């Protein structure tokens, strides 16, 4: 008798679990119409709920398998070295005018001291180097954004912002689904 009761209780729990999944899927298809701060609050709430749902579904579908630390560390080091190599090649290939306009502020002493090993190999003194940097920064003009755009450095973030802006206009005037907002989490 208790065994039969436990099987019935298990069946009820499984049915309730399936019902909550169906409700969660339907919840993402709800249409909301919000503007400004209300839209931002809705976005935060949707991202919080959708990431919790993704996390619980991922844990049910595939439990986390511990990976050895030796496997993780070399890949991170390789990624870092690739990034550093790419950035150093990029900085070396920048036109001289763009190098001058990247920073218009006065250099801090710690930034100038980073170049001291370079100065040891050259005939320039530290004070002369500092004067050259200040002179070039004072001559700089602000033409770098167009040159950065032509190099393709800001296309991804700008494209994502433009998509979000069109979505926010749509959510404000027409309405949008929670699923479409969850894509930006």
From Swiss-Prot:
Q: Where in the cell is it found?
A: Secreted
Extract the signal peptide range: 1-24
* InterPro entries assigned to the protein according to its UniProt record, in alphabetical order: Insulin-like, Insulin-like_sf, Insulin_CS, Relaxin, Repro_Hormone_Insulin-like
Mostly located where? secreted
Residue positions assigned to the propeptide: 56-157
Query: Could you tell me the keywords of this UniProt record?
Result: Cleavage on pair of basic residues, Disulfide bond, Hormone, Secreted, Signal
What is one term from the GO cellular component aspect held by the record?
Answer: extracellular region
Protein's UniProt keywords contain Disulfide bond: yes
Q: Name one GO molecular function term.
A: hormone activity
* S-S pairs: 35-172, 47-185, 171-176
| Family statement drawn from the similarity comment of this UniProt entry | Belongs to the insulin family.
Q: What does this protein do?
A: Relaxin is an ovarian hormone that acts with estrogen to produce dilatation of the birth canal in many mammals. May be involved in remodeling of connective tissues during pregnancy, promoting growth of pubic ligaments and ripening of the cervix.
Q: How does it assemble?
A: Heterodimer of a B chain and an A chain linked by two disulfide bonds.
Query: What's the protein name?
Result: Prorelaxin
Supply the source organism for this entry: Macaca mulatta
> What is the primary gene name for this protein?
RLN
């Amino acid at each position: 008798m208790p065994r039969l009761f436990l099987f019935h209780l298990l069946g009820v729990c499984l049915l309730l679990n399936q019902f909550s999944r169906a409700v969660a899927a339907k919840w993402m298809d709800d249409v909301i119409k919000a503007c400004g701060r209300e839209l931002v609050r809705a976005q935060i709430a949707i991202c919080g709920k959708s990431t919790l749902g993704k996390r619980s579904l991922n844990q049910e579908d595939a439990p986390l398998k511990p990976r050895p630390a030796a496997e993780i560390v070399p890949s991170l080091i390789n990624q870092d070295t690739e990034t550093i190599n790419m950035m150093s090649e990029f900085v070396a290939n920048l036109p001289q005018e763009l190098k001058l306009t990247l920073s218009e502020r006065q250099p801090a002493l710690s930034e100038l001291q980073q170049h001291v090993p370079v100065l040891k190999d050259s005939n320039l003194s530290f004070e002369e180097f500092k004067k050259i940097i200040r002179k070039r920064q004072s001559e700089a003009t602000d033409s770098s954004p167009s040159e950065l755009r032509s190099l393709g450095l800001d296309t991804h973030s700008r494209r994502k912002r433009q998509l979000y802006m069109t979505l926010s206009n749509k959510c404000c005037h027409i309405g949008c689904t929670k699923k479409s907002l969850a894509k930006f989490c």
